[in-house]
Amino acid sequence: MEKRDYYEVLGLTKSATKDEIKKAYRKLSKQYHPDLNKEPGADEKFKEIAEAYEVLSDDQKKARYDQFGHEDPNAGFGGGFGGGGFGGFEDIFSSFFGGGGRRQDPNAPRKGDDLQYRMNIKFEEAIFGKETEIEIPKDETCETCHGSGAKPGTQPETCSTCNGAGQINQAVDTPFGRMMNRRSCTTCHGTGKIIKEKCSTCRGEGKVQKRKKIKVSIPAGVDDGQQIRVSGQGEPGINGGPAGDLYIMFRVQGHNDFERDGDDIYFELKLTFPQAALGDEIEVPTVHGKVKLRIPAGTQSGAQFRLKDKGVKNVHGYGMGNQYVTVKVMTPEKLTEKQKQLLREFAEISGDIPEEQGSSLFDKIKKKFQGE
């Protein structure tokens, strides 16, 4: 199935600002988070939203996406030009303009590929950090042959077709005349080596797949979509090169009571009419424990109070965020007759007598004649 446009996924246009992208992601990820939304397809929708945000929130990835769309030749780890169909023309123009010196030695040590792992963590784990362990499938250098791919006691031989270069030259007729085109050697598949007696453990691959446990330190203050690098825990290096790195991207679960925006926490405090009108002192929950908050008399619905340093520790060490408490005054749905009478008396004193629902036509006519 064809991928949807990332801007369309987040309900945005290409002119959207970073702040708009972030807000759209937070809204949609909360709406479709698998822990909060059990509808069929919510999980796939959440993954689509996360993928769109991962690209559009990164300036470099966004710039490439805006230019190439989903056909970005540099997308993903280890990506880049140089696949099947364009290799010939690249070599032709490289030779024509004098770029022939860029050929790589297939036997030179090369760094292994990077790996990416998405890790789901709880709201509190993201705020306070945690030491944990993950288990991932990854390739490891074969311990039997030490990565050579050859049976112990033997060595790979130099390919006689390409003399160990891993590439062969081929004459190609072009509009510029006959030119030499380099192609991967089909005998050794570009490795420059021939393994006559393969290692029985890895079957000549030089590596085996294992499930490896890796210790991970979740940094305090990490936010949804951020990632950390675990050096040397990617795929094994080639020809004795260093291993790649493991990038762990965090997906933070939502919370029933709190909402996070950067280093700040938001909490909705429900008050009764008497509490808002007369004032009160209330215990308010925070991620750090309960604190007392004084509600001044006459507080209106929508009023906001700041609890300094009761938010999230900045992941880069730039201080603490705050918690913002937003008031919501609740209107009682069921009243006793005594409560209704007291409210009527209050309304009379205030000079604002409401036309109550449920009054009979006779009562309304009676009040009219009585001048009420």
Swiss-Prot record:
Q: Which UniProt keywords apply?
A: Chaperone, Cytoplasm, DNA replication, Metal-binding, Repeat, Stress response, Zinc, Zinc-finger
Tell me which residues make up the J domain.
5-69
Picking any one GO molecular function of the record gives: ATP binding
Sites where the protein binds Zn(2+) 2: 159, 162, 185, 188
Q: Does the keyword Transport apply?
A: no
Q: Which InterPro entries match?
A: DnaJ, DnaJ_C, DnaJ_domain, DnaJ_domain_CS, HSP40/DnaJ_pept-bd, HSP_DnaJ_Cys-rich_dom, HSP_DnaJ_Cys-rich_dom_sf, J_dom_sf
Q: Which Gene3D superfamilies match?
A: DnaJ domain (1.10.287.110), Heat shock protein DnaJ, cysteine-rich domain (2.10.230.10), Urease metallochaperone UreE, N-terminal domain (2.60.260.20)
Give positions of the CR-type zinc fingers: 129-211
* One GO process term, biological-process aspect: protein refolding
Q: Where is the signal peptide?
A: none
| Cofactor(s) listed in the protein's UniProt record | Zn(2+)
Residues noted as binding Zn(2+) 1 in the record, renumbered to the chain:
142, 145, 199, 202
Cellular component terms per the entry's GO annotation: cytoplasm
Q: How does it assemble?
A: Homodimer.
What remark about domains does the record contain? Answer: The J domain is necessary and sufficient to stimulate DnaK ATPase activity. Zinc center 1 plays an important role in the autonomous, DnaK-independent chaperone activity of DnaJ. Zinc center 2 is essential for interaction with DnaK and for DnaJ activity.
Q: Which family does it belong to?
A: Belongs to the DnaJ family.
Q: What is this protein called?
A: Chaperone protein DnaJ
Species of origin reads Lysinibacillus sphaericus (strain C3-41)
